[in-house]
Amino acid sequence: MKKTWLILKKIFFWVFIVHIIWFLVFIIRKFSVSDFPVTNLKTKMLIVFAVVLVVGLLYYFRLRQIDFVKKAAIILKEVFFIAYISSTLYLLLGILFNPPVTLTQAGSIFQGHGLHRDYISYDDMGPNIKLAVIASEDQLFPDHDGFDVKAIKKALKYNKRHPNKVRGASTISQQVAKNVFLFQGGGFLRKGLEVFFTFSIEGLWTKRTILERYLNVAEMGAGIFGVQAAAKRYFNKNARDLTMAEAAQIAACLPNPKRYTVKPLSRYVAGRSGNIVRQMYNLAGDPDVQALIR
């Protein structure tokens, strides 16, 4: 057993090296820090880099000579390998299967909202809800590689000018990374992991798979997860039978499904769903979008 574990660690060590180099090359090519406005993000990145560098140098020249630090380093390496191997296997299984449960779904149960979901296949979802979500959340989804750099720049500039009104720029791929692998909320660490998992699913999953996972695990009301559960709860029909207006109402609640309700219809959802329908008509002539939703 110990020998098998050592072999497994060696294999995944090289998988990790290739994975992280691939990721770093992507980040360097995709994002130029100088392209972004001066924000707290830059400061945090520099602080993290400086801390990692200092700790690494201290460990290499001093700390690794201390027995306690040696033992702690061994334990941390084991924990890291277990976490990386588990997440990699989970990532690969995600190509074929919907997640058995997500942290957000578990949190819904503990908060007393329950868990109402009904995973369905991509073909059973119908085109209207797919189009509504793309129109609402990420109109460049068929074409980008997981990130919309222009939207990120705009959001950073807006958030700098309006610190009390935070605007997001997450793509559908980023939301899938958060919903399937991580947890809700902010924080520099979670956002960094979100970037890593977004990069990973874009490299390994197809766009259809990413959209299917999103439409099955996204929260669409308090304790309601996925389009089938939402369609049944709000309109007493299957997801594939939703009209454009009904699909738009479900998509309109996605920014904050506990606050923006479909039933009863909140003012926000009523207003935003009309705009989503108009965007759906605009996307009707986009061949990439149409190829994806059919």
Language model: regions and residue ranges:
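Juxtamembrane regions of bacterial inner-membrane/periplasmic proteins
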Residues: 2-294
